[in-house]
Amino acid sequence: MAVSGTAAGTGLASTPRLFGTDGVRGIANRDLTAELALDLAVAAAHVLAQAGAFEGHRPLAVVGRDPRASGEFLEAAVVAGLASAGVDVLRLGVLPTPAVAYLTAALDADLGVVLSASHNPMPDNGIKFLARGGHKLPDDIEDAVAARLGEPWTRPVGRFVGRVRDYPEGLDQYVEHVLATSDQRLDGLRVVVDCAHGAASVVSPAVLRRAGATVVPIGCEPDGYNINDGHGSTNIETLQAAVRREGADAGIAHDGDADRCLAVDAAGDVVDGDQILAILALAWQEAGRLAHDTVVATVMSNLGLKLGLAAHGISVVETAVGDRYVLEAMRAGGYVLGGEQSGHIIMLDYATTGDGVLTGLQLLGRMAATGRPLADLARVVRRLPQVLRNVTGVDKTRVDTDPVINKELAAARGELGDGGRVLLRASGTEPVVRVMVEAETEADAERVAERLARVVRERLG
């Protein structure tokens, strides 16, 4: 996967947008170079300064990363860029993305920077900027940063250059914050936790142990190269086997930067983000905390989520795919709970982004509070058979305008009627078109998805 855009010293070709739905990503040291990382940091500092974000005070940024080896040199480049632009920097070290977001707000920082490619393979990395308060930068600010890469700037000197120091206490601050969101003890629960050899490898087991659970950690030994390798939320079969082997009550899986959480019940069956969202929605409704009796989900959520929650008087607002769009809809509508099938669960009472560690604690807390097994809680959502086909190596920009694809899409929707759903969308981070089909039977979903994927490949390949 190649980074798009142009940066001084990088030799990257210009394309419409440098920032994807989750920051700038690419293969580290080929696409996402030290030069680009430094340029992005400098440009971000100056764009925010010119927007008045640093007015009247000395600016402060926090920088955190996942354990990828490439994160070390990218961190050095970002820190150098920020300090050279007059921004003081706290290096947080290896921490989950939601921890960086929390500390951006808790430390009243003007900017947060996360170096991670989340669930992507180890050679990839990414840079994501967070605004004051811990929310992702708005699209227009990201575009302004991209537009001004490599421009000459007035460089501060003397006392006006940024200072840099490590801030290891951030880890404990985040752990205490997560624990403070629940007073429900987890004593008696045996839980397998798979951290994908990623950023949650220390934090997630620590939180659950402090809450009283017996924790069996797997995928918690990062070496810089093994992130997401056979472990984590994108390799859930590893956790399924471990839960069965250990006789655990449940399993929790994170991705590389721990903004996701998927679960596994005692039988080893997956409990996905839709089901987790529904379980928490019922808990919050019961406690009188579910604003407007509504949750926010994406168009990729299973139709079973909407049907299951409707039976309890809970509405679902749908957004485009991406946790940033879920968050935007939550803030605009005054909703407090939202998420994605992939396991991004956002709880605005406690966090500004998806938080896998927090989600795991809240989910297990619901199990402990009700005394019900996870499989029983998850039955609130009857998942319709869902088939997803990723069509790679195609021109994703034409997926919405190709007449043949649109004709086939309309035919598929007519064929399935109210008993199913079809969605085509371009990935925000990869050269991929995703074909999603839900139907009453697996065979129907497979047949329609395969037909649409073939048409997309033929028309856009």
UniProtKB/Swiss-Prot annotation:
Cofactor note: Binds 1 Mg(2+) ion per subunit.
Catalytic reaction list: alpha-D-glucosamine 1-phosphate = D-glucosamine 6-phosphate
Biological process annotations from GO: carbohydrate metabolic process; peptidoglycan biosynthetic process; UDP-N-acetylglucosamine biosynthetic process
Cofactor: Mg(2+)
GO molecular function, one term: phosphomannomutase activity
Sites of Phosphoserine modification: S118
EC number assigned by the record: 5.4.2.10
Record key words, sorted: Isomerase, Magnesium, Metal-binding, Phosphoprotein
Modification after translation: Activated by phosphorylation.
Active site residues of this protein: S118
Role played: Catalyzes the conversion of glucosamine-6-phosphate to glucosamine-1-phosphate.
Family assignment from sequence similarity: Belongs to the phosphohexose mutase family.
Protein name, UniProt field: Phosphoglucosamine mutase
